[in-house]
Amino acid sequence: MYFMADDEQIRRYEFKRALEELSKLHGRGTELISLYIPPEKQISDVVAYLRDEYSTSSNIKSKSTRKNVLAAIESIMSRLKYYRFPPPNGLVFFVGHIATRGDQTEMYTKIIEPPEPITTFMYKCDSEFHTEMLKAMLDEKEIYGLIVIDRKEATVGFLNGTRIEVVENVQSQVPSKHHQGGQSSRRFERLIEIAANEFFKKVGEIANNAFIPRIKEIRAIFLGGPGATKEYFFEKDYLRNEVKDKIKDLFDVGYTDESGLRELVEKASESIKDMKISREKDLMDRFLREVKKPDGGLAVYGEKAIRDALEQKMVDLLLISEGIRRVKYTYKCPTCGEEKTFSEEPSEWPVCDKDGTPLELIGEDDMIEDLYKLAKESGAQVEIISDQSDEGKLLKQAFGGLAAVLRFIRKDNVQNVM
């Protein structure tokens, strides 16, 4: 994950974690309901559909399965009463009796407003929850600008994640280079260049109007086309400086319509990959430069050291591996009120130090979200690093998935403890 606003990063992290938890849940039978509701779907139509399913499910032979499926459908219908319309991106319900210890089950309900619009209505009753549509939304959604151009045609578009969006395709009125109607060669060439200049100005205007409003979120712009036209278009003043500065590479492509945009994306794929790797490398290099200093420099790693530094508002940059999952477990004595926290689930149930009373579990908090909150409060920059690159693997394996660069060195220093 790269170049996302901090809030977007943590929302993506929370979303991914929720899907991982859902994937671990199973039912005793086919009694877990996954319901996807697109934003344009009428709630009344969904309720009518569920009533039909309720009627059908009344014929399930297994008494326990029938009871659990009917209870899940009733639960969904009761919750739908609170919605006049689906939210802007739709709504997803995961409801059913999940298997717990032994032969026990318990009712589970998870309602998700997805980060992107649901496109298909889906109802499934199975032994597991279906999260495939939501998992597809985890694909990186970096935005790139695209231009393909020659003297006869040009197309401007965006690459949004894996989806190519065409902004506009424009045909030129530039005549072919041959004599017509007895005109002199010099005069005809002049007319051709005037027409070409007007065409390039029009393409530049389309590109500027498309890219300028989104210039901060555009990672890079790629320019392609057959022959030397793309170089000429790039070198002249058809594009505003803000747009030109974002152009990363020029590529030879055979077409200048929508298929040309697809070809441009294929040609630029290595460049996109290199930019992502370069971004992670720069972040990790900054941290490693500090680690290599004799006194450890401004580097800290490990949950305890980083938490201490965040609480003292010392952290400038916080690096979090996308692959780590940590939960803080909080227990409380029902007698004296003593609390204990654990960074891992205890192998044995904890008891009170004072009287040996078994403690009650009162909270399971995601440690990453907790650190993120501290970082936001202190004004630290937060970057969640993929665990697919060499740098991301190093962060996860060598430093426990958590690393930070401080704003200043504290006199008594922060001890790095994994």
From Swiss-Prot:
Keyword Protein biosynthesis part of the UniProt annotation: yes
SMART domains: eRF1_1
Function: Directs the termination of nascent peptide synthesis (translation) in response to the termination codons UAA, UAG and UGA.
GO cellular component: cytoplasm
Protein name: Peptide chain release factor subunit 1
Family: Belongs to the eukaryotic release factor 1 family.
Keyword Nucleotidyltransferase: no
Subcellular location: Cytoplasm
PANTHER family: PEPTIDE CHAIN RELEASE FACTOR SUBUNIT 1
InterPro entries per UniProt: eFR1_2_sf, eRF1_1_Pelota, eRF1_1_sf, eRF1_2, eRF1_3, Peptide_chain-rel_aRF1, Peptide_chain-rel_eRF1/aRF1, Ribosomal_eL30-like_sf
GO MF annotation terms: translation release factor activity, codon specific
Keywords: Cytoplasm, Protein biosynthesis
Subunit structure: Heterodimer of two subunits, one of which binds GTP.
Cited NCBIfam families: aRF1_eRF1
